[in-house]
């Protein structure tokens, strides 16, 4: 039997989906802009 694929880890989560990572690329900034437009309470992880 194989283990579950999702092993939660806050540091890894922030390093891959965090605000600073998103701001690094044009596409990432677009994601944040879209979430702001939509009115998301949380923009990033």
Swiss-Prot record:
Keywords: Ribonucleoprotein, Ribosomal protein
Alphabetized InterPro entries for the sequence: Ribosomal_bL34 (IPR000271), Ribosomal_bL34_CS (IPR020939)
GO CC entries: ribonucleoprotein complex; ribosome
Pfam families recorded: Ribosomal_L34 (PF00468)
Record family assignment: Belongs to the bacterial ribosomal protein bL34 family.
Entry-linked HAMAP family: Ribosomal_bL34 (MF_00391)
Protein name: Large ribosomal subunit protein bL34
Source organism of the structure: Acidothermus cellulolyticus (strain ATCC 43068 / DSM 8971 / 11B)
Gene expressing this chain: rpmH
């Amino acid at each position: 039997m194989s283990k579950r694929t999702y092993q939660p880890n806050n540091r890894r989560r922030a390093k891959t989906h965090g605000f600073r990572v998103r701001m690094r690329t044009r596409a990432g900034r677009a994601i944040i802009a879209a979430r702001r437009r939509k009115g998301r309470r949380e923009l990033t992880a």
